Curated annotation (Swiss-Prot):
EC number: 5.4.99.12
Function: Formation of pseudouridine at positions 38, 39 and 40 in the anticodon stem and loop of transfer RNAs.
InterPro entries, A to Z: PsdUridine_synth_cat_dom_sf, PsdUridine_synth_TruA, PsdUridine_synth_TruA_a/b_dom, PsdUridine_synth_TruA_C, TruA/RsuA/RluB/E/F_N
Family annotation (PANTHER family): PSEUDOURIDYLATE SYNTHASE, TRNA PSEUDOURIDINE SYNTHASE-LIKE 1
Protein name: tRNA pseudouridine synthase A
tRNA processing listed as a keyword: yes
Family: Belongs to the tRNA pseudouridine synthase TruA family.
Top-level enzyme category: isomerase
List of catalytic residues: D57
Native source organism of the sequence: Frankia casuarinae (strain DSM 45818 / CECT 9043 / HFP020203 / CcI3)
Zinc as UniProt keyword: no
GO BP terms: tRNA pseudouridine synthesis
């Protein structure tokens, strides 16, 4: 850490409904923009920059988002989270705020991100209090078939067929878990964890599983799409509002810096020469 600065870890929860995603964009309301503006106001700083574990898309929620920010070490930290929550819209809450351990990087130190996607196939749709975080599906879903299809996708693969490509960036990811189950209240939940996700990957995976769940495709189909390595027009990206980032996992503090170094080497595209 540069002399004169302190790195803070922020744990955040937000309703993604009113936001055009996490990342600051000109002319758009975003979670990053709201939190950075609140930090500048409360800490009386001309500029701040947040680094986040998971850049959620427009309409995606979070209950376990993690970010870091570097602030001058003379900024009073006592009551900072309370003061931030006092100026932030109620759609965003700072759940925790504390000095980060040495070597911590919210993005690159992370071991994994975990998302949950909620679906209801009840004939009456989503419960009124859950309509903003649960997809109402109009047809019955075969959850055992969806769960069987999910098993073929777990592991290290090139997920290019389920990602929007970014020039120079890898689409190889390690999918640690993709569990699909029906909870006692009837809601179908896809529980997804990976070392990292490329753009639209979780929602594309859910879209493929929905095609299996309603019987349009066999359980082996998502894996066949995966191995072909190109987008299939039959894979629809599931709507954003059913998706919530629930957890970001980190190694023990002494391993944070080493993890960040390894991840940077894999995730950052090389700078073009010439």
């Amino acid at each position: 850490m540069t002399d004169g600065l302190v790195r803070l870890r922020l744990d955040l929860s937000y309703d993604g409904t009113p936001f055009a995603g996490w990342a600051r964009q000109p002319g758009q309301r975003t979670v990053q923009g709201d939190v950075e503006d609140a930090l500048m106001r409360v800490a009386r700083l001309p500029a701040v920059r947040l680094t986040v574990a998971g850049r959620t898309d427009s309409g995606v929620h979070a209950v376990g988002q993690v970010a870091h920010v570097d602030l001058p070490d003379d900024v009073p930290l006592g009551g900072l989270a309370r003061r931030l929550n006092g100026v932030l819209d109620r759609a965003v809450r700072i759940i925790g705020l504390a000095p980060a351990p040495p070597g911590f990087d919210a993005r690159f130190s992370a071991l994994s991100r975990r998302y949950v996607y909620r679906i209801t196939d009840a004939p009456y749709g989503a419960e009124p209090l859950r309509r903003f975080d649960t997809l109402a599906w109009p047809r019955p879903l075969d959850v055992p078939a969806m769960a069987a299809a999910a098993l073929f996708l777990v592991g290290e693969h090139d997920f290019a067929a389920f990602c929007r490509r970014r020039e120079g960036a890898t689409t190889v990811r390690t999918l640690l878990r993709l569990d699909v189950l029906r909870r006692p209240e009837g809601v179908v939940v896809a529980d997804v964890e990976a070392d990292a996700f490329c753009h639209s990957m979780v929602r594309a995976l859910v879209g493929a599983l929905l095609a299996v769940g309603e019987g349009r495709k066999p359980p082996q189909w998502p894996a066949a799409v995966l191995h072909r390595g190109v987008r299939d027009p039959a894979v629809t990206v599931a709507p954003a509002h059913g998706l919530t980032l629930v957890d970001v996992r980190y190694p023990p503090d002494p391993e944070l810096a080493a993890r960040a170094e390894v991840t940077r080497a894999v995730r950052i595209p090389p700078t073009p020469s010439g």
